[in-house]
Amino acid sequence: MIFGQWVFSSNGPGQQPMGTSRPLHVLLVHVWYWPHVGGGDQHVEQIGRELVRRGHRVTVWCADVPAHEERRFRRGGVDVIRITPSRLLGGVDPLVSVSDLDLSDVDVVHLHDTLPVLIRRTLSKAKKAGKPVVTTYHNDYVKKTALGRAVKRIRWVLQGRRTIHSSDAGIVLTPFFEQLLRTKGVQGHLDIIPNGFSPVEEAPRRPSSLPKTEESTPLISFVGRLSFQKGLDVLMDAMDSCGSNPGFHLAIAGKGQLSGWLEDRHANSSAKENISVLGLVTDAEKRWMYENSACVVIPSRFEGLPTVLLEAMHAGTPVVMADVNGLGGLVQECGCGLSVPCEDPNSLAQAMSRVMEADADQASAWGGSGKSASRDYQWDRVTDRVLDVYRRVLGE
């Protein structure tokens, strides 16, 4: 699929799409998984569910963080094994052992990340067992301190790059990340397969925690994990700069480590009467927000290919997207909204105001372009490409 400069491929040089007749046992490995909330978790879960729908067997290995009452269970047809860590390295990397886990009947191992202990130990176990390994590189995380950036560079050279080079196939979500990995010294073919989304099938329902506003007051929505990555501070600063009457109401949906911070920040905001903090919403409520918002705002500091962007596009809702990791270019090329500089509250405020001032034809054009472009990102199409990679590394 070609979209502007975004070229998504899943076949190596000279390769044709592979058949998909034989059922496979696929092991998906990601540190975080349900009930943890995050884009990477959803990516792994949705691929797993789509593979199960096609008759494949899927197992997930993940760390038991946060601790869950069940260590082994089935969810959506996927067998989940949560591994208890002995400790948490740096607050983000669970120290786990996979020595007592069995992958003898696994056909292909699909790693989702490059650096964590779980990923590297599973890679070692799989290579010793002669199992083909596929690794997806999801994101380039921003470190806030000089020490953090230095450690990140060292870990990449010693661990991250080695994970990809030791794999039988590597996947990146966008052309931006392919170019980034080339600058980081990655060699060999990389498949470009985007993140996906599943349209919400439940009927839309207005969030119960969203106050009734006048019908004439447009709604702008933020949907996502409440974290430094997602740029909530930038969004709140932008709202303060809009004054006491911005001409719209902002709804913030999600939970995360900044939930307490957001509660305090909201209470002290000069625009607090125009902001509602909803907490975690259901899929039906999320769908309502997309379908009833003038735009969805994504002020992130770094992203792979966020699900909320794809879901908003599918709903025909214009998007205001921070220009991180090439995503501003995607929004502009498909014509689904506006791109703003990262960490720039004034530009974000201006973009939200511009959406409010747009006439019906412009709003319809943004929405229609996004809806049309979103079709190639639905999980059935994404999984087709992932299966092509599996068949290729299996030599089928």
Region locations from a protein language model:
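Nucleotide-activated donor-binding/catalytic signature segment of Leloir-type glycosyltransferases, i.e.
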Residues: E263-V281
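Short alpha-helical donor nucleotide-sugar binding micro-motif in glycosyltransferases
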Residues: I164, L280-V281, W288-S293
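Conserved acidic donor-binding segment of nucleotide-sugar-dependent glycosyltransferases
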Residues: E333-C334, L338-P345, V355-A360
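Carbohydrate-associated surface elements
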Residues: F176, G196
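Conserved donor-binding/catalytic core segment of Leloir-type glycosyltransferases
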Residues: S209-D240, G367
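Nucleotide-sugar donor phosphate/pyrophosphate-binding loop at the beta->alpha transition
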Residues: P132, V142-R162
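Aromatic "clamp/platform" in nucleotide-sugar-dependent glycosyltransferases that forms part
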Residues: R301
